[in-house]
Amino acid sequence: MFGFGVGIFFFGYFIFEVPSNLILEKVGARRWIARIMISWGVISSAFAFVPSISAVLQSVGLSFFDNARTFYLLRFIFGAAEAGFFPGIILFLTYWFTGHERARWVGVFMAAIPLSAVIGGPLSGLILDAFDGIMGLSGWQWLFVVEGVPAVLLGLWVFSYLTDKPREAAWLAPDERIALQARLDDERKSREAIRHYTLGEALKNPRVLALSVVYFGIVSGNYGLSY
């Protein structure tokens, strides 16, 4: 049951990842990244109350949703909510940094992933032990709540303060906005002159295939150890 619940997350993620990034391009990073963070936090907190949610669903005639199926449903929605966050952040960085600068900031972003695991493990253990029984909730329930609430709050902050693109940055001087946007536009024009490949051509490229196999191995190892 647990393994299926873990795996169904990726179905939601896979289905909605590309549409999510396309929507981000249309509505702007500020709105869409904030939406991802807020919905992620809300659903993460909801895992603490699976039995209660199951009871509500059954009370309105959806008797199919016992605790296990409610857990599966939340995991699928959780994947759909998170879909697009990682590529969305990478896309957002292209709005602000040239290719030469971008590698450094992508590295900083990627470094946060293992750092969160280093900090999150001991912190999770502390929450499980110290919060157990508070307000009638078990430690594992508090773990989901404490995980979800900061994401919601940070999402609200992102919605209020994140700036989509340099031309909209009121905190930059006018000449700084113009200079930065000009550099980015020049790089974009040079990229447009490069031949673009179709999806089929990319999938036939030996380097793409090799990197896909390597990345699949990395992700499989990470999630295998995590779960």
Q: Regions from the language model: what does each represent?
A:
Residues 38-65:
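C-terminal ends and interior cores of transmembrane alpha-helices
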Residues 1-15:
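Extracellular/periplasmic helix-loop-helix junction of adjacent transmembrane segments
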Residues 103-129, 150-151:
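Glycine-rich segments within core transmembrane alpha-helices of 12-TM secondary carriers
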Residues 200-227:
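Extracytoplasmic gate region of multi-pass secondary transporters
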Residues 74-111:
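Cytoplasmic helix-loop-helix junction between adjacent transmembrane helices
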Residues 104, 109, 135-199:
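Central mid-sequence intracellular linker of multi-pass
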Residues 15-29:
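Helix-to-loop junctions at the C-terminal end of transmembrane segments
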